[in-house]
Structures are given as structure tokens and as C-alpha cells.
Amino acid sequence: SVGCDSEEGFDLAVRHLMRLGHRKIGLISGPLDSYILKARYHAYLEALDKHGLEINENFIGLGYYVAESTRTYIPKLLKEGVTAILFSHDIRAISAITECDDRDIRIPEDLSIIGFDDLPMTSFTTPPLTTIRQDRIALGKCGFYALSCLLNHVAIGSILLRASLIIRESTGP
């Protein structure tokens, strides 16, 4: 398998948010029915635990439909005192920007948000989205290499690529 190091990505994101003063950090994700979403969910829990932050099930929102889950969970997480939310994918974070704008919730003044993937559109949102970057070109090259190995009956292990945090304007103190 080929993938991005979710643990490293969430660790970078939580450290960044802690430097900004955040201590109640939530997660909004899709349902935990895929390997990637499970890995990102566990990476979130690991990062909170590593940095001594509260792990609270009320800080987590899991939902299949993107717009519906942001509409449902953003108010719930804010009522719980969450000041920053990590998202399993950039699309969910972009949906959150729209939802927050509709509710007059200012980003990053009222709520900091971080996505995951670094899709090209994230630098054009208002505000531009802070996100955990997966190097899509490197993922593609490694995927091609892994497929070539399999086709040639060469055994390989998992390939895990480094994550990086792209700091833009959706996070603040």
C-alpha cells in the first residue's frame, strides 16, 4: 500500500494549534468504514494523547454526507467549547468554511480549521485553508512503482510518505 503518514500530519496540526493557544480540538470526518478514515481518526486520537490534550467523544463528529455533517457538528462542537477543528479531508473543511460564513462564525477569530490533502482549491478559499499536505505527485510515482513491483511478482511493503503542514489563514489564536 502507498499512503501519507496521517500520524505525522495530525501531530503537526495539533502542535500548530497548541502554539496558537488551542486546547479543545475537535474532529469532523466521514464514517470509519475505510482504511484512510480509520487511520486519520486514530492519528487524531494519538496526537491529542501525545500532547496531553483531552480526548472527548463529544469533540468528534462522524457523518457520511459532507454538508449535512458540517451543518450538524459545527454548532455541537462549538457548544462543547471546541476552538479548533481538524477535518479528515479538505472538502469537509471547505464545506465548514461555507457553513461558518452562513452562521456568522469568523474563521480564524472564532474557530480555527485545518483540512487534510492540500487540494489546489484550498489556497483560493476565503480564508485560505491551512491543511496537511499529501504530495500527490510522489503518491502517484510510488503507486506506479508499487504496481510495477506487483506486476513483476516483486514483494514490497507499505510505502508511507511524509506529511507537511501548509499554514494559511484559517488558523489563528
Locate predicted features:
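Bacterial carbohydrate/catabolite-sensing allosteric modules
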Residues: 1-173
